[in-house]
UniProtKB/Swiss-Prot annotation:
This is Sterol 14-alpha demethylase. Pathway: Steroid biosynthesis; sterol biosynthesis. GO terms for cellular component: membrane. It comes from Pyrenophora dematioidea (Helminthosporium dematioideum). The chain crosses the membrane at residues 41-61.
Length: 540
């Protein structure tokens, strides 16, 4: 039985030698759709744009007509997923100050699909930095970005209690005796760089400051914290590995940390190779092939966790990578800003030189090698570092992920789980309410001012030794709370010694009569001077 062309039923005898395939083939077939019958590209684009417009309109209506009174106000934005990403990413401080002027210290903005609740000012610093671990955490925010760079078993790739133990190990490796030894090492490293670098050949010249200071700070950190073997390996190959590993801090990796982008492939290869380098150094030390030293690697080799388990060599290696990577950006960028400001204000450079003559020179006017107790006499040098950290902290935003409903003190608002909370110590450090004329670089503002620290009643032990909560201050260049930077003392010392050595050897001024310092580049994870950032130097 079948259908005729006219649609009538046709009976076919079972024994009839009819080829069913031939019969079916003889039936009319519908021709395939031609290209002209398909939707045009213009139609598809128009449809896509229509959907986007509909989403944008719905998003605008929701913001204007149906705000959630139980949550902080939301910064107006056109598109629901993109939110304020473009304006925030272009200049975070400009965005935060503008939003603060309109909404107050507490507000929410949308950043690539995530709601970010901002709390500014001293109260905001305390709110975010002193949040309980059960209420908010850093691991889920920074883990995707940092874990592939730092490696397994350290920092955000482990429970917070283990991280606190690791911070304790590193902190107690930065003893006063260790800092005393670091001064000479740092000074010699800077002097040797000046003698050997092509950038400082002759009586005068011009340098692009950021790459020069990046090299100097990685050399000083390596010799002081990492040991002579690591310093000796800072060749072109190691520098290339560092560069590839540093590429893992690309902002896109907050969202796509394991995507097969070229920079991620290079990151993973560099992490493995760098870890193998450290493991080889540790193996040689355990075999007694290298004389005992007092650096961080030797210290960590003798440490054990609370459960009695010695730190595995792989974790020591990853901790050393973390120390190298985590501190390098801030030190390099701050050292660059110091040089740029001294070139912009040459009289301040001369004040620094005169301070060394007044405090350290012998009866013949000769300056001795630096030591920890002599560096501590250089108050203006210390003020230069503090003031530069105040104005140019490399990390403009610090976030945590909210895990349970979080009431905002002194408001009727609650931050829901899934939001990120954001503190920006740089906003309070550059606000008129805390610092007079905050946009002016003025080291002398610290002549009679001390860094506000909490009193003894505010001391707390997060698991790595008693420390100030350090959050009720407008000046927090190294963060606060349980995640406060433990390398703070070394960072200050490193920057002060580098500054002292550079001032001893050179005078600085701007190129071609340029006024002021370059702008800030916010295109990477760590803000830095826009390049080229050139200055003139002249030997004393």
């Amino acid at each position: 039985m079948g259908l005729s062309h006219s649609g009538e039923i046709v009976y076919i005898h079972p024994s009839s030698p009819v080829d069913l395939f031939t019969t079916c083939a003889s039936l009319p077939t519908k021709p395939p759709p031609s290209f002209s019958d398909m939707p045009s590209p213009l139609f598809l684009v128009s449809g896509f744009l229509g959907v986007c417009v509909a989403y944008a309109v719905a998003n605008i209506i929701r913001q204007l007509l149906f705000p959630n009174a139980k949550e902080p106000p939301v910064v107006f934005h056109w598109f629901p997923w993109l939110g304020s990403a473009l304006t925030y990413g272009k200049d975070p401080y400009k965005f935060l100050f503008a939003a603060r002027a309109k909404y107050g210290d507490v507000f929410t903005f949308v950043l690539l699909g995530r709601n970010v609740t901002v709390h500014l000012g001293v109260a905001g610093n305390d709110f975010v930095f002193n949040g309980k671990e059960t209420h908010m955490n850093a691991e889920e925010i920074y883990g995707p970005l940092c874990n592939p760079v730092f490696g397994e078993g350290v920092v955000y790739d482990c429970p917070n209690s283990k991280l606190m133990e690791q911070k304790k190990f590193v902190k107690f490796g930065l003893t006063t005796d260790a800092l005393k030894a670091h001064v000479r090492l740092i000074e010699h490293e800077v002097v040797n760089y000046i003698k050997s670098s092509r950038d400082f050949k002759g009586p005068s010249g011009v340098i692009n400051v950021p790459p020069v200071m990046a090299q100097i700070t990685i050399f000083t950190a390596a010799i002081a914290l990492q040991g002579p073997e690591v310093r000796s390996k800072l060749t072109n190959e190691f520098a290339s590995l560092y560069h590839d590993l540093d590429g893992g801090f690309s902002p896109i990796n907050f969202v796509l940390p394991h995507a097969p982008f070229p920079h991620n492939i290079k990151r993973d290869r560099a992490q493995l190779k760098m870890r193998k380098i450290y493991e080889a150094i540790i193996a040689e030390r355990r075999a007694g092939k290298i004389p005992p030293t007092t650096d961080m690697i030797s210290h960590l080799m003798q440490c054990s966790y609370k459960n009695g388990r010695p730190i595995p060599d792989s974790e020591i290696s990853n901790m050393m990578i973390t120390i190298l990577m985590a501190g390098q950006h801030n030190s390099s960028n701050i050292a660059s800003w110091i040089m740029l400001h001294l070139a912009n204000e040459p009289q301040l450079c001369e004040e620094l030189y005169q301070e060394q003559l007044d405090q350290l020179a012998d009866e013949h006017g000769n300056l001795p090698e630096l030591e920890l107790h002599t560096v501590e006499k250089l108050k203006l040098h210390s003020s230069v570092v503090k003031e530069t950290l105040r104005m140019h902290n490399a990390i403009h935003s610090i976030m945590r992920l909210v895990k349970q409903p979080l009431p905002v003190p002194n408001t009727s608002w609650t931050v829901p789980p899934g939001h990120a909370v954001l503190a920006s110590p740089g906003v309070s450090a550059n606000s008129n309410e805390y610092f007079l004329n905050p946009t002016k670089w003025d080291p002398h503002r610290w002549d009679d001012r001390v860094i506000e620290e909490d009193d003894e009643s505010e001391m707390v032990d997060y698991g790595y030794g008693r420390t100030s909560r350090g959050t009720k201050s407008a000046y927090l260049p190294f963060g606060g709370g349980r995640h406060r930077c433990i390398g703070e003392k070394f960072a200050y010392l490193n920057l002060e010694v580098i500054t002292a050595v550079m001032v001893r050897n050179f005078r600085f001024k701007n190129v071609d009569g340029r006024v002021d310092v370059p702008g800030t580049d916010y295109s990477t994870m760590f803000s830095r001077p826009l390049e080229p950032a050139e200055i003139c130097w002249e030997r004393r």
